[in-house]
């Protein structure tokens, strides 16, 4: 319906009522977000993939939170190391702080295993092809620095 289209087009734009969402999606897709009216709906491309359940080998689990970070080392399903460290990513503008905190956690966990077969990461945000498109943890890192990494 063209009335709904015009409404959505008006609110999801720069200076529109939903400018935050427009800007967010523009960052995710790396181009200005736009509302498009079409008569043709593309065919769905769903391809379900079973994930998880792998307990064999040497694995690291990492959770990047807003006030702490957690990391665990697991060998053949048994936890061999686990730590929780207070950190402040949401209020820190220096990208080295983030990088060093994450690398330190991963290296510490890895030091408790003979090798690393897999790393699983949990963090709020949108990640595409191992690239951080948007993440609340890096709110204070300027875009000029953020997109260098």
Question: What do these predicted ranges mean?
Answer:
Residues 1-2, 61:
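Short hydrophobic beta-strand segments
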Residues 46-81:
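Gly/Thr-rich phosphate-binding beta-strand-loop-beta motif of the actin/hexokinase/Hsp70
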Residues 58-61, 100-116:
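Short amphipathic alpha-helices and their capping/turn segments at secondary-structure boundaries
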Residues 76, 114-115, 130-131:
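Generic structural signal for short, solvent-exposed loop/turn connectors between secondary structure elements
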């Amino acid at each position: 319906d063209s009335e709904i289209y015009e409404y959505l087009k008006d609110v999801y734009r720069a200076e529109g009522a939903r400018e935050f969402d427009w800007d967010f999606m523009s960052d995710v897709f790396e181009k200005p977000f736009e509302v498009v009216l079409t008569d043709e709906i593309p065919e769905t491309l769903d391809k379900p993939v079973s994930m998880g359940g792998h307990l064999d080998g040497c694995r690291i689990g990492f959770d990047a939170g807003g006030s702490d970070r957690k990391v665990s080392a697991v060998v053949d399903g048994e936890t061999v190391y686990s730590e929780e460290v207070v950190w402040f990513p949401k209020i820190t503008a220096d990208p080295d702080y983030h990088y060093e905190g994450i690398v330190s956690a991963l290296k510490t966990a890895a030091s408790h295993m003979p090798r690393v077969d897999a790393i699983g990461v949990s963090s709020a945000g949108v990640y595409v092809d191992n690239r951080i498109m948007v993440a609340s943890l890096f709110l204070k890192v300027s875009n000029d620095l953020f997109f260098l990494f």
